Swiss-Prot record:
Pathway: Cofactor biosynthesis; ubiquinone biosynthesis
Gene from which the chain derives: ubiD
Transmembrane residue ranges: none
Role according to the record: Catalyzes the decarboxylation of 3-octaprenyl-4-hydroxy benzoate to 2-octaprenylphenol, an intermediate step in ubiquinone biosynthesis.
Cofactor note: Binds 1 prenylated FMN per subunit.
Subunit structure: Homohexamer.
Organism: Pseudoalteromonas translucida (strain TAC 125)
GO biological process, one term: ubiquinone biosynthetic process
Binding, prenylated FMN: 175-177, 189-191, 194-195
Reaction(s) the record says it catalyses: a 4-hydroxy-3-(all-trans-polyprenyl)benzoate + H(+) = a 2-(all-trans-polyprenyl)phenol + CO2
Protein name: 3-octaprenyl-4-hydroxybenzoate carboxy-lyase
Any Gene Ontology CC annotation: plasma membrane
Amino acid sequence: MKYKDLRDFIDLLEKRGELKRITQEIDPYLEMTEIADRTLRAKGPALLFENPKGYDIPVLANLFGTPKRVAMGMGQEDVSELREVGKLLAFLKEPEPPKGIKEALGQIPVYKQVLNMPAKEVKKAPCQEVILQGDEVDLTKLPIQHCWPGDAAPLITWGLTVTKGPYKKRQNLGIYRQQLLGKNKIIMRWLSHRGGALDFQEWCKENPGQPYPVSVALGADPATILGAVTPVPDTLSEYAFAGLLRGSKTEVVKSISNDLQVPASAEIVLEGYIMPGEMAPEGPYGDHTGYYNEVDDFPVMTVTHMTHRKNPIYHSTFTGRPPDEPAILGVALNEVFVPILQKQFPEIVDFYLPPEGCSYRMAIVTMKKQYPGHAKRVMMGVWSYLRQFMYTKFVIVCDDDINARDWEDVIWAITTRMDPARDTTLIENTPIDYLDFASPVSGLGSKMGMDATNKWPGETNREWGEPIEMDKATKDRVDDIWQSLNIL
């Protein structure tokens, strides 16, 4: 299941009943959000608004509104198959030499996939069929959603931002929200630890006072979009990972105004620069926490060129109290995370990010405990191994007899296997999401680890409780007569 571009994916979704075309006039101001929100909560299809009020460009929404569609976007038929994607990433993150001929032969398919990694630069691309520059650029002609009543302005939500630092060979792809500021101005809301912000900081040191080139792709193919939100190893580019998912090299084209490579099949591309020191207050916006966030200053991007396909499609989403698309992406990508964590911590049985925890703020881990203090080691590992979890506020560790995805099981473990003073680990002054207004300082807060495992000698002086369980013989006898009892 491979897609050349977003339009291929739309066609397949429609054939499978996973996409609904809406011909009625719908307003990008609030109405699209309400319709997409109701559709997502009902586990409904992707939506193609063909008649946005006041615009002649259709809007694609709720594209990744179910875990199944996320898996399809990664070239898989089912969410369970994403474990294989995670295993591939784990191998690429820490490759191991084969232990023999048989194992070497077994790795051949992986190396064949690796051949699809290098991006392929093309001279002519669909994303540059129409080129606008200078005064021709008018971002207000795009049907950018105004998602919530208290939002400051329309917000670009699926912009795939392409940057490059002065010391790095490869480009960085990241998805950062962008507030519409004017006909040719947007605010780039990237947090200081994110790849784009780090590239910009390095540029400012190396080229003080010089404009920093940036390109933003809208409506890239699913593999490239998802490559930008997946925990790819630092040595692997997002374009390379997209090639692995797609089974063919990612086609890119040089931007018109700079040397950055953008997805050749993207629907719309914004090109321009950020002038060091040019900042603007961003927000407030309703975000994935379910609240409006604080206003803060972020860099301003001046758009000098806008290129697009003929009859482009604008890809959009909203963020709000879970479930929203980021939460659904988290559920699906959870399956990618598990093998990566297990590669480093083989004792981990399962790892779960409950969507109601705003995608990443709470993690539940089940493990095969092997020694006193083992749960705390796993907690620290989760917080430190992948940068995706540096903002995870709560980590709950349970034994492998607990189902990490069943709250009844987890709550039972917490209330019966934990002593709050002994089994709670608090760490202060750690990086926290800037959108987390509960932290005492913006971007800096605390983390809590909860050891809900059975305690070993050395962790307790008391005789530990033995779980109640009926013997198998009795269960079997009752199974035999259960239907005849006619109780239920």
